[in-house]
Amino acid sequence: MVTQTNPVPVTYPTDAYIPTYLPDDKVSNLADLKKLIEMDSRLDLYLTRRRLDTSINLPTNTKTKDHPPNKEMLRIYVYNTTESSPRSDSGTPADSGKTTWTLRIEGKLLHESANGKHPFSEFLEGVAVDFKRLKPLGMGKKRKRDSSLSLPLNLQQPEYNDQDSTMGDNDNGEDEDSAEAESREEIVDALEWNYDENNVVEFDGIDIKRQGKDNLRCSITIQLRGVDGGKVQYSPNLATLIGMQTGSVNDAVYSIYKYILINNLFVTEQTEAQDGSNDAEDSSNENNNKNGAGDDDGVEGSTPKDKPELGEVKLDSLLQKVLDTNAAHLPLMNVVQTVNKLVSPLPPIILDYTIDLSKDTTYGATTLDVDVSHILHQPQPQPNLQKEEETDAEDTAKLREITKLALQLNSSAQKYQFFHELSLHPRETLTHYLWSSKQNELVLQGDQYFNEDAARTSDIYSNNNNDRSLMGNISLLYSQGRL
């Protein structure tokens, strides 16, 4: 059967076919085009060979990096300085009404070179400081424990319970005191700074200056920049399995996958056969043990178990605890999708600090080291990306021009072949040209060339004895979509 096929698309301009009868001296730069096609074929052969070598060697090269990149640590200092405080250790006389203090929050990158200095604001997304103070107790408000302490209760208790009861009373009193203190705290002042990409400000520290003569508690909240999912916090059960509190989602998925491989938890034909034999032995043992049991017990013992399918993962006790499920087996894709529910964004850093006015400065008393490798090692936009895009656009325009020139060359080759044949055999060439033009006209006209009477009086039905002719006509109708 004759079927119509689509022409093979030309992927590259150099894939164009150059007729052998074209003379090099008549077509300009034809020799250069042949050299270009030959060089292109060599380049394709080399790239194919290198691609095969890479595909063969890549699976065997599973060795990870021996020396991971060093962690970049940011040290955060929180301290206060005091001026004109009568309780300071400077020994100079001061006026209590003019006592001022300054709270400073600054950060420095450890092991930082002088050339590549990073300001503290580069690592921050926002900073909030809440100053808290205890509310004064009301005159009629009394503590519950005071009334109980004022009554001498002489209760006789066993000797071995005296110590325990005393410790319990003290603990309850401390809990009540802490809960009462937290409930009495009120925010007397607050300060907040957030990063604004339209108004970028660089600084190495934040100074907050206030006037006061009493110690003051404050809560400092620091939100680091770069919390975009590259580094997340794991759930407690997932952190127990992986051995790290934070990391990426890809690391968590890879760790679970390695745990499944090491413990042979994939359901394969071999493991399924082993499980089937173990189940058969267990069922036979149960039947032997329950040989004299009643009918109801026999029905319960013969209930078939839900067996896992091929490609699923058998969940042991640790995986069931990590994934928070009671299922005995799950598909691998469900295990991967469940990992997204076990991670959360990195929480902000919260520090409780007390401004101490008894010292001139508390520098170095409160420090915190934070890993900022995920912020410094983020991929930066390439400065030459725009130039590369412009170069790609120029290359695309040149490829289009080469394609157009190749089409013009093929058209000129057909004209050259026609006139060359016409100069050698003019009569035969013109006769063949008229016949091919007539055939093309019939093809273009299609059904318009034939009318109904001509189709009825045609001898196509009288020559039905010729099977080859009949099959050819049917194939032609099928190829044109007319049947």
UniProtKB/Swiss-Prot annotation:
Transmembrane regions listed in the UniProt entry: none
Segments for region (Disordered): 142-183, 273-309
Biased composition (Acidic residues): 171-180
Taxonomic superkingdom: Eukaryota
An individual GO BP term: positive regulation of transcription elongation by RNA polymerase II
GO CC terms: chromatin; nucleus; RSC-type complex
Subcellular location: Nucleus
GO terms assigned for molecular function: structural molecule activity
Keyword Mitochondrion in record: no
Biased composition (Low complexity): 148-158
InterPro entries linked to this entry: SWIB_MDM2_dom_sf
Family annotation (SUPFAM superfamilies): SWIB/MDM2 domain
Keywords, in A-Z order: Chromatin regulator, Nucleus, Transcription, Transcription regulation
Entry's family note: To yeast SNF12.
Function: Component of the chromatin structure-remodeling complex (RSC), which is involved in transcription regulation and nucleosome positioning. RSC is responsible for the transfer of a histone octamer from a nucleosome core particle to naked DNA. The reaction requires ATP and involves an activated RSC-nucleosome intermediate. Remodeling reaction also involves DNA translocation, DNA twist and conformational change.
Protein's UniProt name: Chromatin structure-remodeling complex protein RSC6
